[in-house]
């Protein structure tokens, strides 16, 4: 699980800034803390353009750079009013009772990438530019040069895809945790799965059926269920999906009325809810990080509160990091004070956070 992220000269964060997810001495809401003492998530609040989404981006970039094709040397990540041509991100994770620290720095002028990886403070990997040395499989170290090290790619990614870290169960478990992570931008309606988790509603229903989603609705008295079929009937209404019998559609049925309502005719809030539920339930059940930007877009305050409570209660080794403008989530009946981060932009000093 993620325990810390540190941003330095990154986007709006001119000065080195750390977000810590280790629990503090608060005793309320013990269900919001995993059994290893790490918080199951946190909220970032603040004014528009304060830097809230930048923190989410800092976590997302690790996933992008490891599992997607993305160029590290892009100058868009450098703080434009900062000092120097380098930006850096560092992360601390707790995996199988071992502390993993990973750091990378990018010089966007010289196009040089630096990386370091430690497990319990023992150096496992170091990289400078086009040369690297790994101690993961060989304690004496294995040297790599420009034939193995790409100027635009994390060497950690290269080693992972070449070896899957079969010689190191801790790193293998770390990668498995990261691949279970999912990013959601509620405003753009963009959902990215970094592993095998199915986040398309239709494909999720094809493989998992409606049971888990309807169970979520029933448990929290939503007074509605969904059906996923070629046709749906209720009252004097019957809908049939165009095409042969293999073509299916999503229908809502409100209890007490039972008339089917096609997905596209449902309220925007219900559409948004159903779109993110596969990702939401996947992370709860499988682990990983659920990163949500603009969580408050398209949701009623009570629904946001319900979903945060549900995640904290049901998740085990999973985390939900999210941006929201809903101040009702700052209640101590929903989140602990150590799960709440206020983000502020202080002119020439850039973005700052306060726990």
Residue spans for each PLM region:
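Short polybasic amphipathic segments
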Residues: 5, 87-92, 112-119, 247-255, ...
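Conserved P-loop NTP-binding catalytic core
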Residues: 37-43, 47, 56-107
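Short acidic-glycine loop/turn motifs at beta-strand connectors
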Residues: 95, 107-109, 345-349
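A short mid-domain helix/strand-loop element embedded in enzyme catalytic domains
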Residues: 182-194, 242-259
